């Protein structure tokens, strides 16, 4: 069946301290919160929601489960470094530029930039 999937609607990230994570994702990444209730907080990221989930047993992946897209990756990297966020170096692969960073729970997340 063609057209079964239209987009990824929501990405979930488990966090150990929802209030701290809400503050970090709002202030450091500049995301706008859609709603916050019952141990969940959703942020707008383009058409996709990033939903933080309060959890007690946090397991971090060994690689980023997704990348945030930006058109100014070097400025984003600089801003994260200035905010004392643990980041990897920016890597230019030619057709895509990326770097990874960690949120307060140590989740590896990424930024990418490429010509659309």
Residue spans for each PLM region:
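Helix N-cap motif at beta-to-alpha junctions
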Residues: 17-18, 71-73
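N-terminal beta-strand motif that seeds the catalytic metal site of vicinal oxygen chelate
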Residues: 1-20, 49, 64-66, 115
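Short amphipathic alpha-helices within nucleic acid-binding modules
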Residues: 24, 74-79
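Conserved short beta-strand elements that form part of the metal-binding/catalytic scaffold
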Residues: 32-64, 108-114
């Amino acid at each position: 069946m063609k057209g079964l999937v239209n987009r990824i609607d929501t990405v979930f990230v488990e966090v150990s301290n929802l209030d701290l994570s809400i503050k970090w994702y709002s202030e450091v990444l500049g995301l706008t919160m859609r709603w916050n209730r019952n141990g969940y907080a959703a942020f707008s990221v383009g058409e996709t929601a990033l939903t933080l989930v309060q959890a007690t047993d946090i397991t971090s992946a060994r690689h980023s489960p997704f990348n945030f897209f930006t058109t100014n990756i070097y400025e984003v990297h600089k801003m994260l470094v200035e905010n004392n966020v643990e980041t990897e170096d920016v890597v230019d692969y030619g057709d895509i530029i990326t770097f990874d960073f960690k949120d307060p729970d140590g989740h590896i997340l990424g930024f990418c930039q490429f010509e659309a």
